[in-house]
Amino acid sequence: MEENSKSVLTESQVAAFNERGYLVADFSLNESMLDAIVEKVQPLYPEDYQQNPTLPARVQDAWKSIDEVRQLARDMSIAQALQQLVGRQSLPFQTLNFPIGTRQFTHSDTVHFNSIPSNYMAGVWVALEDIDEDNGPLLYYPGSHKLHEYSMHDFDLEPGYHNYHKYEECIQKVIER
């Protein structure tokens, strides 16, 4: 870790992350910034979503056009926490915004993007809507970060979106073992 890096997490938080593979942390993010993100991203959702908000929608890489998203992606406290957790400086490279929770099935983000060396990809999720256990929280399986990285090829599936649901089913079976 670099000498000028600051510890923002306790030793017990780091140990919990190493054991479970995820960490819930409060970085006291600026609420005005978060509200501005919601407001400024809203018009970027596709027209079909604007007409029917029950349809799934997302905006990828809003950090390229919205200052507040870029500010969040580069938040120093989050970057310092990531450095404590993985022992390397982080490089934010993608943002995904959703108007509401995505209702995704069990999956591994490494099928979408990865890192070299492997096992250094970390995702940061910031809820921009109020959530609780009844309305769509993010679900992690404790310890799943210690599993093998599975690609579609590992399940004899041809790569591509047409096999994504089958991939999710295979990942769910691995998790349930």
Positions of the model-derived regions?
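Short, conserved beta-strand element in jelly-roll/cupin
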Residues: 116-133
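Short beta-strand segments in beta-sandwich/barrel cores
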Residues: 23, 130, 138
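Short, structured patches in soluble enzyme cores that scaffold and shape functional sites
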Residues: 108-110, 126-130, 142
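Non-heme Fe(II)-dependent double-stranded beta-helix
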Residues: 1-20, 24-117, 153
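Residues in well-ordered beta-strands of folded domains
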Residues: 93-99, 125, 139-141
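Double-stranded beta-helix
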Residues: 134-177
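A structural signal for well-ordered alpha-helical scaffolds and beta->alpha junctions
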Residues: 10, 75, 79, 121, ...
